[in-house]
A protein has these predicted regions:
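Gly/Ser/Thr-enriched, mixed-charge loops and adjacent short helices
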Residues: 1, 14, 104-230
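An N-terminal, well-structured beta->alpha segment
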Residues: 1-65, 89, 143-174
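General beta-strand structural signal in soluble alpha/beta enzymes
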Residues: 6-7, 42, 68-73, 93-94, ...
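N-terminal small/polar loop signature for handling phosphorylated ligands or for N-terminal nucleophile
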Residues: 29, 39-103, 189-248
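Gly/Ser/Thr-rich active-site loops/lids in small-molecule metabolic enzymes
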Residues: 117, 200-202, 253-273, 337-350
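Proline/glycine-rich low-complexity loops and linkers
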Residues: 122-156, 160, 249-322, 326-328
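Phosphate-binding and adjacent anionic-ligand microenvironments
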Residues: 234, 271-449
Length: 449
């Protein structure tokens, strides 16, 4: 079965099967028609399918009458920042984030630099399904402009927002692995602006990912292996569009991506209190942190668009997910890996503490993340069947099924990006978390054989 995942903020699939130039042209035409000839920005990650899809999107937007500013290879958070900076009508980011090389996607961004909300997404999808796209006359075709100076715009603002002087004085040695994605090369500019010593790993923007581009401990072996040898202070892993990060401590410990958001929140909420948004699959660490800082916590469905839209609606100060995504709303309403890394460096510099010492201040839980392949036609019926396991338990059904008790929880949901059912379980011990996950996994396997 060919896989195409259509969501409120874009479309994702396997290149050559469902993600083909014709489909990209139709979706870009729908988005251009929705924007009504406003300026639109386009950027992409380094995937080898990127140039093909990029050109298809550019031509289709121009055909609808939109002026297009082409940023080329560009991390998604920088693209989002530039939408607001240039007062554009929106943007398309061509990236599949944490998915492997065979995948690619179009992500639609509105004039505020955020992913489309449900209502905006439905409008674009309606236009796409109707197939009635604006077709500009020859004298009204959009204009194409290319730019390469956007990095200085972004990093100058980031430097001003952070305490760059404290970071520079700390003389931090930092390893960053952008996985040959959109952050490759850009991390050099990042280091120059903030004044730390950069040791890059996989810093060639060639699109051939040397490992799975999901920032998780299992992909951190290369960074962890050299941490002690070169006496680095911290290491970071990035996904292909720099919207998510994970951390490697100076002692070589490959930290779960679940630590990223609580680490930021614990420090930020000392400075500015307010509502915090997370999702249903994130660790209880963030619950403990917000309780300690006396700040309200609200939970959205899993998906960056849902978290950001709830954050805007609730006037939240922070949003984040257990995937390593963090948004500081006063900087921009977007998950931003550069801001996340910079803020962690600022915490280390200002508090004069090692990353292992900062993480030790956080509560510790054990989390297990698994996924099981499930044909798209069966996903929702399988998730529904799982309810029978917990018929006598209180459950949250707002996004799949989540069952909690005093010692932990398990969350079962259909993936929005892959033909998978995700099972995430957390407990006070690794054994407890594993037991919760395996109970569900064994049941699901009987249904998908």
């Amino acid at each position: 079965m060919k896989l195409l995942k259509i969501g409120i903020s874009g479309v994702r699939g396997i290149v050559g099967e469902t993600i083909v130039p014709e489909l990209v042209m139709d979706f870009a035409s729908a988005f251009g028609t929705y924007l009504q000839a406003k300026k639109v920005l386009v950027g992409r990650d380094t995937r080898i399918s990127g140039p093909m899809l990029h050109e298809a999107a550019l031509s289709s937007l121009i055909a609808t009458g939109c002026d297009v500013l082409d940023l080329g290879i560009c991390p998604t958070p920088i693209l989002q920042f530039m939408v607001r900076k240039l007062e554009a009508g929106g943007a398309i980011s061509i990236t599949a984030g944490h998915n492997d090389l065979k995948w690619n996607a179009l992500t639609f961004i509105d004039q505020e630099g955020t992913y489309l909300n449900v209502f905006q997404g439905e409008e674009v999808l309606d236009i796409y399904h109707l197939g009635k796209f604006d077709k500009a006359a020859v004298d009204r075709l959009g204009k194409l402009e290319k730019t390469e100076n956007y990095l200085d715009n972004y990093f100058a603002c980031l430097k001003k927002y952070l305490n760059a002087e404290a970071i520079r004085k700390a003389r931090l040695k930092v390893i960053i692995d952008p996985c040959s994605g959109a952050g490759a090369g850009v991390i050099d500019v990042f280091s120059r602006y903030l004044g730390f010593e950069l040791i890059p790993v996989n810093n060639e923007p060639n699109g051939y990912f040397p490992h799975d581009p999901e920032p998780r401990p299992r992909n951190a072996q290369e960074v962890a292996s050299v941490m002690k040898v070169i006496k680095a202070d911290v290491g970071f892993l990035l996904n292909s569009d720099v919207s998510r990060i994970s951390i490697v401590a100076e002692n070589g410990e490959m930290l779960s991506e679940e630590f990223t958001f609580p680490l930021i929140a614990s420090e930020y909420l000392k400075r500015k209190q307010g509502t915090v948004i997370t999702n249903l699959s994130s660790s209880r660490m963030i619950e403990d942190v917000t309780r300690m800082r006396k700040c309200p916590l609200m939970k959205a469905k899993v998906g960056q668009s849902y978290s950001i839209q709830m954050a805007l609606y609730e006037d939240a100060v922070l949003a984040g997910e257990g995937s390593g995504s963090v948004a500081v709303l006063e900087f921009q309403p977007a998950f931003d890996g550069f801001l996340t890394m910079g803020f962690i460096l600022e915490i280390m510099a200002s508090r004069k503490k090692k990353i292992s010492e900062l993480v030790a201040e956080l509560p510790r839980y054990h989390i297990v993340k698994e996924k099981i392949y499930c044909p798209p036609t069966k996903v929702h019926s399988v998730v529904h069947e799982v309810k029978k396991l917990f018929i006598d338990r209180k459950m949250d059904s707002s996004d799949g099924i989540k069952v909690e008790d005093e010692d932990g929880w398990v969350h079962i949901r259909a993936s929005a990006t892959e033909p998978m059912i995700r099972i995430i379980a957390e407990g006070r011990s690794r054994e407890n978390a594993r037991e919760r996950a395996e109970e569900v996994m064994n049941f699901i396997l009987t249904l998908v054989k």
